[in-house]
Amino acid sequence: MPLLNDQLKMITCSDFRLFLKKLIKETSLDRIRQLSAHEIGHTLGFGHNFISSANDRASVMDYPHPLLSYKDDRIIFENVYDKGLGKWDLLSVEYAYSNNSDLEKIASKANSKDLRYISDNYARPKNSAHPYAHLWDNGKDPVMELEKILIIL
C-alpha cells in the first residue's frame, strides 16, 4: 500500500473509506495466508521458529507482528505481513524430505546463510530472556524495533 499521509491529502471521505476497506482486506488476506502456511507447517511436523523475525522473516513458523514503517511523518503499510515461504521454511522442507547422506550439507547451507532455529522453550516462558527469540516481534534489534513502534503509536 502507498504511504497513507500522501493519499489523505487528495481524497474525499468516500475515497478514504474505499482505501481503508482495501487496506484492511489486503492486510487480512495476507495474514490469513501466512497463518495457513504456519498451520500447514505444523501438520508437516515443523515447530515454531521464534528467531526468524530477526532474519528477514525467514519462516512462517514464527508469530509475526504486523510490520509497519514510518518515514517522513508517514506510516507505510507495505509488506505488513510477508508473502510466501521463507528461507528457513524451504530449507526445513528440503531437510525433512532428503536422504540421510544429504542432511549435513543442508545444515551447513543453513549455517552459511545465518539461518537459525529457536523454539518455544527459549521464547515463550515468563523467565525467557533470549534477545532474538520473542513472540510477536520484528527485526534484529529488539530495542530499535520498540522505538519504531513507539514512533508510530
PLM feature spans:
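Generic structural signal for short, flexible, solvent-exposed coil/loop and linker residues
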Residues: 24, 35, 49-50, 82
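Conserved catalytic/binding loops enriched for acidic/polar residues
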Residues: 23, 27, 55-153
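Metzincin-family zinc-dependent endopeptidase catalytic domain
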Residues: 1-36, 43, 66-70
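Active-site proximal loops enriched in glycine and acidic residues that flank catalytic Cys/His/Asp
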Residues: 32, 48, 52, 65
